[in-house]
């Protein structure tokens, strides 16, 4: 987590089966992902990457991307973010989602605070 560093945070992210982040971009933040379990598809810029255990991805600032868990089981990912703190975005997003359909203004505020410009919506596969 970001509690003891000024530059990077590292954390595990469990991506539910069928979850899709929706296309988004970070103006300042850079991200790395290392796939531990499961199978995901990343759309990074104009490329599609099928990520299986052992795949490492780097997403620089300003590059639109989305992540989709294409398997029937949760995927586990080790994620780093610089500057640190993006793990709190996921924590707060989960809190909003637990209340039912998130309030659009609360969601927009959350995204603004965590350098996330959402281009398409969060979703799950049907």
What are these regions (language model features)?
Residues 21-23, 44-49:
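Short beta-strand segments
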Residues 2, 19, 39-40, 66:
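Hydrophobic small-molecule pocket/channel-lining residues, especially in calycin-type beta-barrels
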Residues 1-23, 29:
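A short glycine-rich, His/Asp/Glu-containing loop-to-beta-strand
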Residues 19, 28-29, 47, 63-64, ...:
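A generic "binding-loop/recognition-motif" signal
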Residues 39, 46-64:
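Short acidic-glycine-tyrosine-enriched beta hairpin
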Residues 17, 28-40, 45:
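Glycine- and acidic-residue-biased ligand/ion/polar-headgroup-sensing regions
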Residues 66-126:
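Double-stranded beta-helix
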Residues 10-14, 32, 48, 56-58:
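Conserved hydrophobic/aromatic beta-strand scaffold that supports enzyme active sites
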């Amino acid at each position: 987590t970001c509690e003891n560093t000024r530059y990077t945070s590292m954390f595990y992210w469990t991506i539910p089966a069928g979850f899709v982040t929706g296309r988004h971009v970070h103006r300042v933040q850079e991200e790395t992902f290392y796939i531990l379990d499961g199978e995901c598809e990343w759309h990074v810029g104009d490329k599609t990457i099928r990520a299986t255990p052992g795949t490492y991805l780097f997403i620089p600032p300003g590059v639109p991307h989305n992540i989709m868990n294409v398997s029937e089981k949760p995927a586990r990912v080790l994620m780093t973010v610089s500057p640190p703190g993006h793990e709190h975005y996921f924590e707060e997003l989960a809190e909003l989602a637990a209340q039912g359909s998130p309030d659009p203004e609360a969601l927009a505020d959350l995204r603004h605070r965590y350098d996330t410009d959402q281009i398409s919506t969060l979703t799950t596969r049907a």
